[in-house]
């Protein structure tokens, strides 16, 4: 498909990139046909590509940039830290400062282990749960994405689903034989799997809001049900809040829904645009990590001073006003999407929570992975391309979600709604 915008330089760079980088990208979610645009710079809620195009950004690097791109406070703090060093290999005070902030915000957090990504965080949390319970099996939900590691890369969402590989080759069957898959929002399926695997399940890991298969919300009472059934059966409940952490509220999904998990993983927003992840939870579990316990977890860049500095500066700015404003922006866009789809008789379902939203081109309610997969992905890509031609960038997949930042102002929202109207009319 040829886009009706100037992308000559991006085309050149993509052709060169394909010679050196697999598929021309470093993560499959960044790939779309005929080729992705190449960014030269970013500021506030805008991306500027190598051809001079300006795009309003609702992808926000897949979530982290809640304060907008190139935030001056974060940049100044990071520059000051870089003058003091970029990696130490020994502890620094800032690690304590950020850990305290995490503990003050996240309901289940009593101790923290910083890592370098959401993938590392979920991998470590699952290992911890298995070590603590001395059980091997885990429950994950169909379509949930918990990073690109072998324990959970089965029937997953995000780029794996977009590019047709929800079950990755290269993972031995023995690795995933202990990964039990069930549909999201299905209480009976949870009860059945637990009863069939009595005293064998170490943990249930879930995205409280499934943000890697669009935006699938938990049914009323579902998270409370999971909390109760895990407690009854000695199963550790892990909330993967890499997306929802610090986005739904100060305390993430746990605070937003009033449910306290045993362990939680966070990332994205926590790093303010720099690589980071964290495992957090009950002290009695967390202290089983080495050096206090026998469960090994380590990393050269764990608690990296640059990432930690950016995290401290980011969390300083996430107050009640921030959440009220970013939620309002997502509410406005979600309402407009519903109204415009109805106006042009486009079958669609729109879901939003706090500053997360997504549209599915489907006439059925989306409550599971299978529901999401039944959506019209070809229509979604036509919608995506028309938005792009009109200066709006969203993730190029039906199975990702959109985000608002504090920098999406009224003028930006108006331009976005104009682009949405054009896109819906063309469908």
UniProtKB/Swiss-Prot annotation:
Coiled coil: none annotated. It catalyses: (S)-4-amino-5-oxopentanoate = 5-aminolevulinate. The keyword Isomerase applies. GO terms for biological process: protoporphyrinogen IX biosynthetic process. InterPro entries: 4pyrrol_synth_GluAld_NH2Trfase, Aminotrans_3, Aminotrans_3_PPA_site, PyrdxlP-dep_Trfase, PyrdxlP-dep_Trfase_major, PyrdxlP-dep_Trfase_small. The keyword Isomerase applies. Transmembrane segments: none annotated. Its EC number is 5.4.3.8. Pathway: Porphyrin-containing compound metabolism; protoporphyrin-IX biosynthesis; 5-aminolevulinate from L-glutamyl-tRNA(Glu): step 2/2. It holds the Pfam family Aminotran_3. Its main location: cytoplasm. One of its GO terms (molecular function) is transaminase activity. This is Glutamate-1-semialdehyde 2,1-aminomutase. It comes from Methanococcus maripaludis (strain C7 / ATCC BAA-1331). The gene is hemL.
């Amino acid at each position: 498909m040829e886009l009706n915008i100037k992308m000559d330089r991006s085309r050149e760079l993509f052709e060169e990139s394909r010679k050196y980088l697999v598929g021309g990208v470093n993560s499959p979610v960044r790939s779309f046909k005929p080729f992705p645009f190449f960014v030269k710079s970013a500021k506030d809620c805008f991306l500027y590509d190598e051809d001079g195009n300006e795009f309003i950004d609702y992808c926000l690097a897949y979530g982290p940039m809640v304060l907008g791109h190139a935030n001056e406070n974060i940049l100044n703090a990071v520059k000051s830290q870089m003058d003091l060093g970029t990696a130490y290999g020994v502890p620094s005070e800032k690690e304590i400062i950020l850990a305290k902030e995490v503990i003050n915000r996240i309901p289940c957090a009593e101790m923290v282990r910083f890592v370098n990504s959401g993938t590392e965080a979920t991998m470590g949390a699952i290992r911890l749960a298995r070590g603590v319970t001395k059980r091997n099996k885990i429950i994950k939900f169909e379509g949930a994405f918990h990073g690109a590691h072998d324990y959970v890369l089965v029937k997953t969402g995000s780029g794996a689903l977009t590019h047709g590989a929800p079950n990755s080759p290269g993972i031995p069957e023995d690795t995933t034989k202990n990964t039990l898959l069930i549909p999201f929002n299905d209480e009976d399926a949870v009860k059945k799997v637990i009863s069939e695997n009595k005293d064998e399940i170490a943990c249930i890991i879930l995205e409280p809001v499934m943000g890697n298969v669009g935006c699938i919300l938990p049914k009323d009472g579902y998270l409370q049900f999971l909390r109760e059934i895990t407690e009854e059966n000695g199963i550790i409940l892990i909330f993967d809040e890499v997306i929802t952490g610090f986005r739904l509220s100060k305390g993430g999904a746990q605070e937003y829904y009033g449910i306290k998990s045993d362990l939680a993983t966070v990332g994205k927003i926590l790093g303010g645009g720099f690589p980071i992840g964290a495992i957090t939870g009950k002290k009695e579990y967390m202290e089983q990590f080495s050096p206090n316990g026998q469960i090994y977890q380590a990393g050269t860049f764990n608690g990296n001073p640059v990432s930690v500095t950016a995290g401290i500066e980011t969390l300083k700015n996430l107050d009640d006003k921030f959440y009220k404003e970013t939620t309002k922006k997502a509410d406005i866009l979600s309402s407009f999407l519903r109204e415009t789809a109805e106006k042009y008789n486009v079958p669609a379902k729109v879901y939003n929570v706090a500053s997360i939203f997504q549209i599915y081109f489907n006439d059925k309610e989306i409550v599971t992975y299978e529901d999401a997969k039944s959506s019209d992905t070809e229509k979604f890509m036509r919608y995506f391309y028309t938005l792009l031609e009109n200066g709006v960038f969203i993730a190029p997949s039906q199975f990702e979600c959109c985000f608002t930042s504090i920098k999406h102002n009224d003028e930006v929202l108006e331009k976005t709604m104009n682009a949405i109207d054009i896109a819906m009319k063309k469908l």
